[in-house]
Curated annotation (Swiss-Prot):
It is an enzyme of class 2 (transferase). This is tRNA N6-adenosine threonylcarbamoyltransferase. Its EC number is 2.3.1.234. It catalyses: L-threonylcarbamoyladenylate + adenosine(37) in tRNA = N(6)-L-threonylcarbamoyladenosine(37) in tRNA + AMP + H(+). Its main location: cytoplasm. The gene is tsaD. Fe cation binds at H120, H124, D310. It holds the Pfam family TsaD. The keyword Acyltransferase applies. Required for the formation of a threonylcarbamoyl group on adenosine at position 37 (t(6)A37) in tRNAs that read codons beginning with adenine. Is involved in the transfer of the threonylcarbamoyl moiety of threonylcarbamoyl-AMP (TC-AMP) to the N6 group of A37, together with TsaE and TsaB. TsaD likely plays a direct catalytic role in this reaction.
Length: 343
């Protein structure tokens, strides 16, 4: 069959509203960002210490049309130039997802444009293709607020979850520990910053689980941090928050990097891709770089910070592959908060 040559440029409009970002992007050929607009709601959720689904949905309703128009203007295109619309159908908050799905269906119907549903985590993985062409087989370490998993891919559009969290996602643990240390939401960046000022002097558990397991568990670690703080308060002992942050972060990163490294060897992959919101963590990025610098036959790809947190360019990138593989959604497409990436 020879090399696959694209006859014309494929222009995909991506829409992402799975949590607290209203995002619309335009991507060319699955690799080049033409427009990438994100309206964040962090300020609205800050005082509640987490995302409030009802508030998130209302914001999406207010923002979606504005963000959509802004993306088209930034890309300097009209709906006639778009080959397909890719939208996050799940997983996420059902009310939030529905706003994006309904907006995508309305545009697809009004302008007679093909529609493609995208898995949110597939989007995070394909954010890496906006940095560099991916090579198979590959392994993706997905670390976000709701997900922590190792995903093996032997080809485009094929996802095998070889390891996942059995309880809390790494991002959840970060937010809960941040709350224990009275830090504002979202906690991840605050812990990361504080960790760099401290030393990992506090002995905290690492959940390795069974010897051959690639699964993760962070609830024990989270409880250990909360108990350490609680016990110190009861005994009137002062614990340096930066040392606690450094100890917690080292425990999380140790397990993530060790398991990713072991899986990369076992599955003989060509590339390891970092994906998800926690991929913005400086400590994690540095440790992965150090680990994979020692492996000559494995290339590590880490997306820029702007592509780690939720955005629609990654949804358009994943949607390009689905579109080229002939996948189409009908106007019956619905939000699916529990969508399985392997389905």
């Amino acid at each position: 069959m020879g090399e696959y040559i694209m006859e014309k440029n494929t222009i995909i409009l991506g829409i992402e509203t799975s949590c607290d970002e209203t995002a619309v992007a335009v991507v060319k050929n699955g690799t080049e960002i033409i427009a990438n607009v994100v309206a964040s709601q962090i300020e609205s959720h800050k005082r509640f210490g987490g995302v409030v689904p009802e508030i998130a949905s209302r914001h999406h309703v207010e923002e979606i049309t504005v963000v959509l128009e802004e993306a088209l203007k930034e890309a300097n295109i009209t709906f006639d130039d778009i080959d397909a619309i890719a939208v996050t159908e799940g997983p996420g908050l059902v009310g939030a997802l529905l706003i994006g799905v309904n907006a995508a269906k309305a545009v697809a119907f009004a302008h007679d444009i093909p529609l493609v549903g995208v898995h949110h985590i597939a989007g995070h993985i394909y954010a890496n293709r906006l940095v560099k062409e991916v090579q198979f087989p590959l392994l993706s370490l997905v670390v976000s607020g709701g997900h922590t998993e190792l995903v093996y891919m032997k080809e485009h559009g094929s996802f095998e979850v070889i390891g996942e969290t059995r309880d809390d996602a790494a991002g959840e643990a970060y937010d809960k520990v941040a709350r224990t240390l009275s830090m504002p939401y979202p906690g991840g960046p605050h812990i990361d910053r504080l960790a760099h000022e401290g030393k990992p002097t506090i002995d905290l558990p690492r959940a390795w689980l069974e010897p051959d397991s690639y699964d993760f568990s962070f609830s024990g670690l989270k409880s250990a941090v909360i108990n350490t703080v609680h016990n110190a308060k009861q005994r009137g002992i002062e614990i340096a928050p930066e040392d606690l942050a450094a100890s917690f972060q080292e425990s999380v990163i140790d397990v993530l990097v060790t398991k990713a490294s072991r899986a990369a060897d076992a599955y003989n992959v060509k590339q390891v891709l970092l994906a998800g919101g926690v991929a913005a963590n400086k400590g994690l990025r540095a440790r992965l770089e150090a680990e994979f610098a020692q492996k000559e036959n494995v290339e590590l790809i880490i997306p820029p910070l702007s592509l780690c947190t939720d955005n629609a360019a990654m949804i358009a990138a994943a949607g390009t592959i689905a579109y080229e593989q002939g996948k189409r959604a009908t106007l019956a497409l619905n939000a699916n908060p529990g969508l399985d990436i392997e389905a």
